[in-house]
Amino acid sequence: GSICLEPKVVGPCTAYLRRFYFDSETGKCTPFIYGGCEGNGNNFETLRACRAICRA
């Protein structure tokens, strides 16, 4: 889906949440640290969810 093409957004908050995003350049779901607010749809709690939605 199109959310998989959105850029990784850490956001301005300071929570330290391990999430995954689909990297459209590599075609893989990649871990990143999410701040907890103002993210976008390319933000998954599990690698499995990222792969399922973005077909990585």
From Swiss-Prot:
Write down the position(s) of the site called Reactive bond for trypsin: 14-15
Q: GO terms for CC?
A: extracellular space; nematocyst
Disulfide links within the chain: 4-54, 13-37, 29-50
Identify the residues that the record assigns to the BPTI/Kunitz inhibitor domain, covering every copy.
4-54
Query: Which cell locations does it reside in?
Result: Secreted; Nematocyst
Q: Which domain of life is it from?
A: Eukaryota
- Asked whether the UniProt record includes Secreted among its keywords, one would answer yes
> Looking at the keywords, is Disulfide bond present?
yes
GO MF assignments: ion channel regulator activity; serine-type endopeptidase inhibitor activity; toxin activity
Q: Which UniProt keywords apply?
A: Disulfide bond, Ion channel impairing toxin, Nematocyst, Protease inhibitor, Secreted, Serine protease inhibitor, Toxin
- PROSITE patterns documented for this protein: BPTI_KUNITZ_1, BPTI_KUNITZ_2
Q: In the UniProt entry for this protein, what further remark is given in the free-text comments? A: Negative results: has no activity on Kv1.1/KCNA1, Kv1.2/KCNA2, Kv1.3/KCNA3, Kv1.4/KCNA4, Kv1.5/KCNA5, Kv1.6/KCNA6, Shaker, Kv11.1/KCNH2/ERG1 potassium channels and on TRPV1, the capsaicin receptors.
Function as written in the Swiss-Prot or TrEMBL entry:
This recombinant serine protease inhibitor inhibits trypsin (Ki=210 nM). In contrast to other sea anemone serine protease inhibitors, it does not significantly blocks histamine influence on intracellular calcium concentration in murine bone marrow-derived macrophages (tested at 1 and 10 uM). In vitro, it shows cytoprotective activity in the oxidative stress agent 6-hydroxydopamine (6-OHDA)-induced neurotoxicity model. In this model, it decreases reactive oxygen species (ROS) levels, and increases cell viability in a correlated manner.
| Similarity comment | Belongs to the venom Kunitz-type family. Sea anemone type 2 potassium channel toxin subfamily.
The name this protein carries in UniProt is PI-stichotoxin-Hcr2m
**Which organism's genome codes for this protein?**
Radianthus crispa (Leathery sea anemone)
